[in-house]
Curated annotation (Swiss-Prot):
Annotated source species: Lophius americanus
Protein family per UniProt: Belongs to the insulin family.
Source domain of life: Eukaryota
Propiece residue ranges: 56-93
Stated name of the protein: Insulin
Alphabetized Pfam families for the sequence: Insulin (PF00049)
The protein's assembly and partners: Heterodimer of a B chain and an A chain linked by two disulfide bonds.
SUPFAM superfamilies in alphabetical order: Insulin-like
Subcellular location: Secreted
Signal peptide region: 1-24
Alphabetized PANTHER family for the sequence: INSULIN (PTHR11454:SF9), INSULIN/INSULIN GROWTH FACTOR (PTHR11454)
One Gene Ontology cellular component: extracellular space
One GO BP: glucose metabolic process
An example molecular function term from Gene Ontology annotations: hormone activity
Length: 116
């Protein structure tokens, strides 16, 4: 019951702030899971919204220069460095609405960027 009330309250705040002619500044807030989806439905309306769950990191790793020799020839140190770089590359690529609005607070203008 409390979760439903919190969800309804969050949507009401977004609705009031996004009402045309409203002089209030949209407060940035964390929106995750169903709260994020509901906020997108509210903000985007009939236009709908798009969502790309996770970009393929392997496509971007194809831009890296080929390795000279294998991990055995290069030594264990290079193998560790290679895996650390791949993790760092994945962190740089994984950006989207979840990172923008769930991990960090976002406002109504951020949500509008995901509308069709």
């Amino acid at each position: 019951m409390a979760a439903l009330w919190l969800q309804s309250f969050s949507l009401l705040v977004l609705l009031v702030v996004s009402w045309p002619g409203s002089q209030a500044v949209a407060p940035a807030q964390h929106l995750c899971g169903s709260h994020l989806v509901d906020a997108l439905y509210l903000v985007c309306g009939d236009r709908g919204f798009f969502y790309n769950p996770k970009r393929d990191v392997d496509q971007l790793l194809g831009f890296l220069p080929p390795k000279s020799g294998g991990a055995a020839a290069a030594g264990a140190d290079n193998e560790v460095a290679e895996f650390a770089f791949k993790d760092q590359m994945e962190m740089m690529v994984k950006r989207g609405i979840v990172e923008q609005c769930c991990h960090r607070p976002c406002n109504i203008f951020d949500l509008q960027n995901y509308c069709n």
